[in-house]
């Protein structure tokens, strides 16, 4: 089969302005709850897009760890490529692809670092193995073999066998403060429904976009 011949119809239903919540965070939480209840694989997985100092875009999958009225939170190694990008350009884009529900959410905004207290609160809630992995990996750095990483993990596991694991200085979180949030719902005959929430002077405005 040719790639150009791969297509399907979207039949889950449309999205109408009257059904939208006034606040996009409330609308996002409503859709996220439905994605979770539908038993989607990794419903909190999102594509995080950043750009380097030359304007070259990069994307990767990261898990959303919190969302509230202030924005969307994720955690990472502060030496990672994404964190280095955000140091010189805090503009960021998030994308949630909920394919089985024929939905997408696209977010643009600005990322800011979380406080040390916020980092510690989340880090200490993680399983011990996840804490050790965060400490063992210098994300995005070059390594000669997987064995180097596994060896470091085992070394740290032995070192902290009977004690608490400190929050690494090179690990932390970011909060993405949204400037726009677009909700996309697949529609019949490719007449998809798109609604864009844009923030102007502290208020959210909603516009329907052509598919």
Swiss-Prot record:
Substrate binds at residues 7-10, 65, 122, 126, 130, 190-192. Binds 1 FMN per subunit. InterPro entries: Pyridox_Oxase, Pyridox_Oxase_CS, Pyridox_Oxase_N, Pyridoxamine_oxidase_dimer_C, Split_barrel_FMN-bd. PROSITE patterns: PYRIDOX_OXIDASE. Transmembrane segments: none annotated. Pfam families: PNP_phzG_C, PNPOx_N. The keyword Oxidoreductase applies. NCBIfam families: pdxH (TIGR00558), PRK05679.1 (NF004231). Catalyzes the oxidation of either pyridoxine 5'-phosphate (PNP) or pyridoxamine 5'-phosphate (PMP) into pyridoxal 5'-phosphate (PLP). This is Pyridoxine/pyridoxamine 5'-phosphate oxidase.
